[in-house]
């Protein structure tokens, strides 16, 4: 048996029923709200969350909010709309471009970009990316800026720590504006906001504090990403969504979660996180999965470091005990 097998849910129907009960209990009894709002991103996590909400409450009590902006992948909106139609839920589309412009989100990032690449214009696309094959490298490598011009040529530039943090902070505004948009609609309709952060992301802090982490319910929080895919298959989530590479969808040039943050596949992430949880030795995992020990040791260290640095994201703010 491989460690991937341990993450396989043989009782998936029961898990789905329990998730539905969890949602209904919180909406009807704990929070006493009229329904649920889900931010539909066109990705698998939000698709599973929305489908579970419909199964728990019925389609008339679920609202799908679609929040594109000028740098969003057009497929995100297309997939979200088709899913909503399949689920027969009401949707609202709120374009966030003007709000983000008022925060100077695009300008802040583009000022840094133009210092590196003066030829940058509206025909160019860009992203921040971590180096390829990160686990095979001998040292920890810093994320870099990648720009695609109108001729599809790619240019790479190193970023200083200050430049990286500035671009990251500006990008986080996108997630925080999504959160405020969700809560505006939630409060005026007396609906709960349901998040879609999974365990693989939660452990490493791959969410924005008071952004996509700012929600009322997190049904997927204790499910690894590979388990979310199992639920998606059980729920018959469209293949155009399940086959799509997971992405933050916050950069004009598309970048996957693996390329932007993790530096490894979800198979590795989930297997190692499971091993940490169950105190399984690293060497045993490598032998079981036939993985290179040095590469997996580096992956283990990367996950542990992210887990430690993101502790504050999984806890309430410290308070003075008076």
Residue map of PLM features:
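ATP/NTP-dependent adenylation/nucleotidyl-transfer catalytic domains that generate, transfer
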Residues: 2-38, 48, 52-55, 60-63, ...
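Conserved G/P- and acidic residue-centered "switch" motifs that form tight phosphate/ATP-binding loops
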Residues: 43
């Amino acid at each position: 048996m491989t460690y991937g097998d341990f993450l396989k849910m043989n009782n998936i129907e029961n898990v789905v029923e329990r998730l539905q009960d969890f949602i209904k209990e919180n909406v009807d009894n704990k929070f006493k709200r009229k329904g649920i709002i889900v931010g539909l991103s066109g990705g698998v996590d939000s698709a599973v969350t929305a489908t579970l909400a419909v199964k728990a409450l019925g389609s008339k009590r679920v609202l799908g909010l679609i929040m594109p902006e000028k740098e969003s992948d057009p497929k995100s909106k297309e997939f979200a709309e088709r899913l909503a139609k399949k689920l027969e839920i009401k949707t609202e589309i709120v374009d966030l471009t003007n709000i983000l412009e008022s925060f100077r989100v695009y300008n802040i990032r583009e000022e840094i970009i133009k210092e590196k690449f003066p030829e940058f214009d509206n025909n160019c696309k860009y992203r921040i990316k971590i180096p390829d094959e990160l686990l095979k490298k001998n040292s920890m490598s810093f994320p870099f800026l990648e720009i695609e011009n109108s001729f599809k040529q790619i240019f790479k530039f190193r970023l200083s720590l200050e430049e990286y943090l500035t671009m990251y902070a500006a990008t986080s505004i996108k997630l925080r504006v999504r959160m405020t948009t969700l809560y505006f609609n939630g409060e005026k309709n007396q609906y709960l906001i349901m998040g879609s952060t999974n365990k693989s992301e939660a452990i490493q802090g791959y969410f924005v504090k008071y952004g996509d982490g700012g929600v009322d319910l997190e049904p997927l929080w204790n499910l690894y990403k590979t388990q979310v895919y199992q639920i998606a298959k059980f729920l018959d989530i469209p293949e155009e969504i399940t086959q799509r590479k997971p992405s933050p969808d916050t950069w004009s040039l598309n970048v996957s979660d693996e390329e932007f943050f993790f530096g490894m596949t979800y198979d590795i992430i989930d297997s190692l996180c499971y091993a940490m949880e169950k105190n399984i030795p690293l060497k045993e995992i490598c032998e079981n999965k036939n993985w290179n020990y040095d590469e997996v040791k580096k992956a283990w260290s990367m996950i542990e470091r992210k887990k430690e640095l993101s502790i504050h994201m999984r806890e309430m703010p410290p308070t003075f005990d008076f």
